[in-house]
């Protein structure tokens, strides 16, 4: 049943996520991830995980030599196949198929809430990061008042038009996809990594 609901939704999801008020908020999140970066910050290799159509690519302030994307969806693979600026590799959502200490920076935006074993996956990401490298994480405020109000608005006014699914199916999608709360994820990160900078927006 879940596969039936998600069939052919990837493209609609990406276009909807970056349009209207929701799009403004998502773009703001991407800008904030780059707030302390500039062209003087050069990274040889950057990896973005769960990039979808890679909207963060357009907000990059730092310079780099290679931009890699690790994705699980067929839509992303098809979307980037003719893009010479990125190197996309499809993976199983658990094991990153790269050698240890490969990347100078790893970006993961609004993805950890979807992963069943987030602590293990964070350790997997860290193993691919070079010593002294940067791991940039963006998390949604789910649960949270603003998040819940936004979700209610989408369910009541846009979900049928955008996805052609019911409000109940939309709630089911979110329940099965957002398996980690931000409170749990932040606690895991704070406990394991003391040398980190945290900003709320």
Model-predicted regions and their roles:
Residues 52-95:
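Class I SAM-dependent methyltransferase SAM/SAH-binding core
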Residues 23-43:
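Conserved alpha-helix/loop element of class I SAM-dependent methyltransferases that forms part
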Residues 94-106:
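A short acidic, Gly/Pro-enriched loop at the edge of an enzyme's catalytic core
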Residues 42-52:
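Conserved class I S-adenosyl-L-methionine
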Residues 45, 65-66, 134:
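Residues at the starts of beta-strands that form the adenosine-phosphate
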């Amino acid at each position: 049943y879940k596969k039936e609901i998600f069939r052919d939704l990837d493209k609609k999801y990406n276009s909807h996520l970056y349009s209207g008020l929701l799009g403004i908020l998502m773009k703001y999140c991407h800008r904030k991830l780059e707030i302390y970066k500039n062209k003087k910050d050069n990274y040889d290799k950057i990896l973005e995980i769960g990039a979808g159509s890679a909207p963060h690519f357009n907000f990059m302030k730092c310079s780099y030599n290679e931009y890699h994307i690790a994705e699980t969806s067929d839509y992303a693979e098809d979307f980037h196949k003719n893009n010479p600026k990125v190197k996309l590799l499809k993976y199983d959502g658990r094991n990153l198929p790269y050698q240890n200490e490969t990347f100078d920076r790893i970006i993961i935006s609004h993805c950890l809430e979807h992963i069943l074993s987030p602590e293990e996956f964070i350790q997997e990401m860290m193993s691919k990061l070079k010593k002294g490298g940067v791991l940039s994480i963006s998390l949604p405020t789910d649960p949270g008042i603003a998040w819940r109000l936004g979700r209610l608005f989408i369910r009541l006014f846009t979900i049928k038009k955008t996805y052609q699914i019911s409000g109940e199916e939309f709630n089911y999608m979110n329940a099965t996809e957002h398996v980690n709360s931000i409170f749990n994820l932040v606690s895991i990160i704070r406990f394991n990594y003391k040398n980190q900078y945290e900003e709320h927006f």
